[in-house]
């Protein structure tokens, strides 16, 4: 409420106090960290906004440099919108664990279209605050409803849930997806209330100087669009340095990348996306920095 009343600093102070008073901060630091091994694959897609380009081909390469699909350039801050974990004007790198998840972020619901895609691989292990949280306890009830579906034999670990109740509240708050009614299809949403708490969380992580690279969380769109896939994880990595132009050297030093592929088939199936993912994984990779 402080945030909506125009007091973002008060909102952060209250958020920080709640994490401390309810011992959620300790849960985040001790239970909610995950290591991703080096040479893991991450994907980032971007809608193709160039009309009538290479219609006679299904795909091409070299239309873009890999950095074109990295975080927004510092000199383009004015174009950076508010995202789930990052405030307007603050560049962050958003990547996905598989191509289907990344594609669904560019084309939510039943949308589809031509796009550019790149695969990044991390040069060293990466460390994240894990908001997907299969680790806290094994039941998947958090994203499937509290009661097990009919026919399931899995039991509900009430004790495990209560032990980490504060952490689960934070996880739920970070995954809310609200439906907004647009007066016009061309209307652009510049503010989403469900982003307030995730953005406060990222601010808190930066303020604590935790030895993590970012946050891992479930993709709300991929879970709906491709229910058959398992690991629909997204990752956000905030920039470590704020420069006048270019890209964050610290983030660039973490990754190698393949060349950018551009696809013009507007109706790709999940299996076709999986095939593209394998092709990207087997491509040649070069260091970003």
Predicted features along the sequence, with ranges:
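Active-site and NAD+-binding cores of ADP-ribose-processing enzymes
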Residues: 1-78, 109-110, 115-289
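Short glycine-enriched loop/turn motifs at secondary-structure junctions
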Residues: 84-90
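Short, well-ordered beta-strand elements within core beta-sheets of diverse protein domains
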Residues: 90-96
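Glycine-rich, histidine-containing beta strand-loop boundary motifs that form or position
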Residues: 96-97, 117
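Short active-site loop/helix that positions an aromatic residue
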Residues: 99-111
């Amino acid at each position: 409420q402080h945030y909506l009343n125009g007091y973002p600093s008060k909102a952060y102070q209250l958020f920080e106090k709640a994490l401390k008073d309810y011992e959620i901060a300790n849960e985040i630091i001790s239970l909610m960290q995950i290591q991703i091994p080096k040479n893991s694959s991450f994907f980032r897609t971007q809608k193709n906004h160039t009309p009538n380009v290479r219609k006679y081909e299904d795909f091409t390469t070299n239309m873009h440099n890999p950095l074109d699909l990295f975080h927004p350039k510092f000199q383009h801050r004015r174009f950076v919108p508010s995202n789930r974990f990052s405030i307007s004007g603050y560049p962050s790198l958003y990547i996905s664990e598989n191509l289907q998840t990344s594609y669904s972020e560019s084309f939510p619901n039943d949308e589809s279209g031509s796009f550019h895609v790149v695969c990044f691989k991390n040069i060293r292990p990466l460390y994240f605050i894990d908001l997907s949280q299969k680790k806290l306890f094994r039941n998947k009830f958090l994203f499937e409803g509290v009661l097990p579906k009919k026919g399931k034999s899995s039991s509900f670990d009430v004790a495990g849930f209560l032990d980490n109740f504060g952490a689960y509240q934070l996880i739920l708050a970070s995954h809310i997806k609200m439906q907004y009614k647009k007066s016009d299809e061309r209307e652009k949403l510049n503010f989403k209330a469900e982003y307030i708490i995730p953005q406060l969380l990222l601010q808190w992580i930066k303020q604590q100087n935790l030895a993590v690279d970012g946050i891992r969380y479930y993709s709300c769109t991929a879970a709906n669009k491709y229910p058959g896939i398992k690991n629909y994880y997204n990752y956000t990595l905030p920039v470590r340095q704020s420069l006048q132009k270019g890209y964050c050297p610290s983030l660039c030093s973490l990754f190698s990348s393949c060349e950018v592929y551009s696809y013009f088939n507007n109706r790709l199936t999940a299996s076709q996306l999986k095939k593209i993912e394998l092709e990207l994984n087997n491509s040649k990779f070069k260091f970003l920095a």
